[in-house]
Amino acid sequence: MLTGKLIHPDIMAALALCGHGDKVLIADGNYPLDSKSGQAETVYLGLTPGLPTVTDVLQAIQSAVNIEKAEVMDPADGTTPEIFGQFQSMLGGMELSKLGRYEFYDACCQPGVRLAISTGEKRTFANLLVTIGVA
């Protein structure tokens, strides 16, 4: 039996193939994963509305890899979603790079995005693109 926090076999396999600088998208339930994740390995985790959350998945991912950068989709109206503060807290105060909606979509379609995970997250703008750091 596995004893770590991350036990999903497809996510573990995809992360094992990642190297420094590769990226992982953790998407909310509203994100158009099929059309806006390029050639990334896709994993659909949404079980029910709200489960799992993006922060649940981030916590599991952090138990397996180091994260050196985080990018978020910034609302056009200039508001800051509450979840951005949660991301920063979970990432040790790391500054979030804010991208406009279409800029974020473009970033998620780049070849370096190796894994895209869809969640049941209901909060809007709860999408997170993380860059894997060194071990």
Question: Which residue ranges define each predicted feature?
Answer:
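Long, hydrophobic N-terminal alpha-helical segment
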Residues: 1-40, 44-47
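A phosphate-binding glycine/aspartate-rich beta-alpha loop in the early core of alpha/beta enzymes
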Residues: 36-69
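Short coil/turn connectors at secondary-structure junctions
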Residues: 19-22, 39-40, 67, 111-113, ...
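Conserved phosphate- and dinucleotide-binding cores of soluble alpha/beta proteins
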Residues: 4-5, 61, 134-135
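Flexible, glycine/proline-enriched loop segments at strand-loop-helix junctions
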Residues: 1-2, 45, 70-77, 114-115
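Conserved active-site and cofactor/substrate-binding residues in soluble primary-metabolism enzymes
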Residues: 2, 6, 10, 19, ...
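Glycine-rich, aromatic-bearing surface loops/beta-hairpins
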Residues: 74, 79-135
